Regions:
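Beta-propeller fold detector
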Residues: 47-53, 96-101, 140-147, 190-195, ...
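Loop/turn-rich, solvent-exposed surfaces of beta-rich toroidal or solenoidal domains
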Residues: 216, 223, 246-288, 295
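Conserved beta-propeller blade signature
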Residues: 75-78, 119-121, 168-172, 219-222, ...
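Short loop/turn segments that connect beta-strands within beta-propeller blades
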Residues: 89-94, 134-138, 184-188, 234-238, ...
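Structural signal for beta-propeller blades
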Residues: 84-86, 128-131, 178-180, 228-230, ...
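Short loop/turn segments immediately following the C-termini of beta-strands
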Residues: 81, 125-127, 174-176, 214, ...
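A short helix->beta-strand "capping" segment at the edge of beta-propeller domains
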Residues: 35-62, 295-300
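Beta-rich, blade/repeat-based domains predominating
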Residues: 58-73, 102-118, 148-168, 198-219, ...
Length: 327
């Protein structure tokens, strides 16, 4: 059965908007996905959804260098660097609203449920802070706070934030100290782990991460992007081992659903990996290395059948895959 992608994008894969800064993508190749493309391997095939994530007025939503979140209703929240802040789409890809109020530039997004209410945590890398806000965009918490204290290596370069099953919060300093900090739900520091390097207990860029529930105990799956590898840690930040084969094509982000991890490799493709770390499908794999990992590809050179720079990724509730590119 073919599932949908969106590229924001949606791979139902749903389609998404390519929004390369400095280029007008209002028309022509690369403006939006215009053709449904089947991609992937047998048993793990997806089809792009043309027109998903395109506002009715056809305007470019702005430059993207961030992530997505998906709420329980299936609405998709896409982080932008500009005026829209967080652009919100329903599950059909229709633009519904913007969340502004200082929410631009979220490098990562993750949803949390507290009682009967949903919130989103964002890693706001340019402001050196983590922000928790409700689904209307009202900020309800900011970290670090007075309980956090001094973080080894500082708050600069926060690229990812996760919330564990027990409510602990994890900061990933992928553009900064290359360390991971574990905090209590109230913001108090519990543990600091890692640092710059290529060996055990080190990262060249702990750029993205996801909670992995496929094993007896929950794990953290870290995208060591520039180390071209992925690493499993315990929830207490203890090294378990490298996940899958190396070198990878610079894994930028990961989201796990059921038996599979969906990985955004910034060098031109999305992959699905099983519990053993085997790649079972590659989606919209771009053979043109000159288009990998860049936001500078001219609009007329972008095509419906290939990614350029997948950066953020999330599963949808019905098995969709949503992708934002560095663009």
């Amino acid at each position: 059965m073919k599932q949908p992608i969106a590229i924001l994008s949606s791979l139902i894969l749903t389609s998404a908007l390519y929004a390369h800064e400095g280029h007008n993508h209002g028309e022509g190749v690369g403006a939006v996905i215009t053709t449904a493309i089947v991609t992937g391997s047998e048993g793990h095939k997806y089809v792009t959804v043309p027109g998903w994530g395109v506002p009715e007025n056809g305007e470019n939503i702005g430059s993207l260098h961030g992530d997505l979140a998906v709420d329980q209703s299936g609405s998709v929240y896409a982080a932008t660097n500009g005026e829209p802040g967080i652009a919100v789409f329903n599950c059909f890809g229709n633009f519904t609203k913007s969340l502004k109020g200082g929410l631009a530039g979220m490098h990562s997004l993750t949803t949390v449920t507290e009682g009967d209410q949903q919130f989103i945590w964002g890693a706001q890398v340019r402001k050196n802070r983590a922000v928790k806000f409700d689904l209307e965009g009202n900020i309800v918490a900011i970290l670090p706070n007075e309980k956090t204290g001094e973080l080894e290596g500082g708050m600069g370069g926060l690229t990812e934030l996760l919330v564990g099953p027990d409510g602990h919060i994890y900061f990933f300093m992928g553009y900064g100290s290359k360390k991971i900090h574990k905090l209590k739900p109230d913001g108090a520091l519990v543990k600091t782990y890692g640092g710059k390097g290529t060996g055990k207990d080190q990262f060249t860029s702990c750029h993205g991460a996801g909670i992995d529930l496929r094993y007896d105990e929950p794990r953290i799956l870290v995208c060591d992007r520039d180390g071209r590898r992925m690493i499993h840690l315990t929830m207490d930040l203890t090294w378990i081992g490298i996940y899958g084969d190396t070198p990878m094509r610079r894994p930028a982000d990961v989201d796990v659903r059921g038996d599979y991890a969906a990985v955004a490799e910034i060098e031109g493709r999305v992959i699905l990996m099983d519990k053993a770390g085997k790649v079972v499908s590659a989606l919209l794999d771009n053979p043109d290395k000159k288009q990998w990992a860049t936001n500078g590809v001219p609009a007329e050179e972008l095509h419906d059948n290939a990614f350029s720079a997948p950066h953020g990724i999330k599963w949808g509730p019905a098995g969709q895959i949503y992708v934002t590119e560095y663009s």
